[in-house]
Amino acid sequence: KYHTNWKMLALPSEWANMAYRKAHPYKGYTFKDEVGPQPMPDCGGAEGQRAIPPEQEACLRDLLSFLQEEGKEGLFIVSPYGESLEEQQMYNYMEEIVTACGYRFLNMNNHYEEIGIVFEEDFADYGSHTNAVGAEKCTDFLREYLLEHYTFTDKRGEDAYQSWEESYDRWKTEMETARVTIADRIARGEYAEIVE
């Protein structure tokens, strides 16, 4: 309904993931080392609002009501991508609803410069998803945002979080490989294929 992955249902490994019985080596993260350049959208930070479809607004308001009733915190995030002006205005509309209910709304499309995102290099599929280098930049930005606005307990070194430390060690090794691959693809002008 919101972000479909229905084609993945053909993979037996995904059925184990759905029931949370299969541990993922990177805690759900998938490395993308492709490069699919896209011009930087000129609508990041644009003003104005456009209403979202009524059924989506109803779902958003239901979620906000649930969070309020349960006394839960929530952070609504839009990751950077090759958005249109219409989409930016819809995010502005959603942001007003979310913040009016007392929750934070972080639209990373308003922070390209602070993130350091380079649309010609940091996307895997022509503006929809970041590659590993772009994801690292977004993660660094999000980390700083979270540390500025929330309080966390450092759980590194605790036995219960050992699997996270192991995943992070694996991630660091894979990330180095991805950086080299991405830089090589950019240098050679080898870009991702568009699959219809």
Question: Positions of the model-derived regions?
Answer:
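C-terminal regions of proteins
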Residues: 86-170, 178-192
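Functionally constrained cores in energy, signaling, and assembly domains
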Residues: 28, 72-75, 124-125, 130
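Acidic-and-aromatic substrate-binding clefts and catalytic sites of carbohydrate-active enzymes
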Residues: 51-56, 82-89
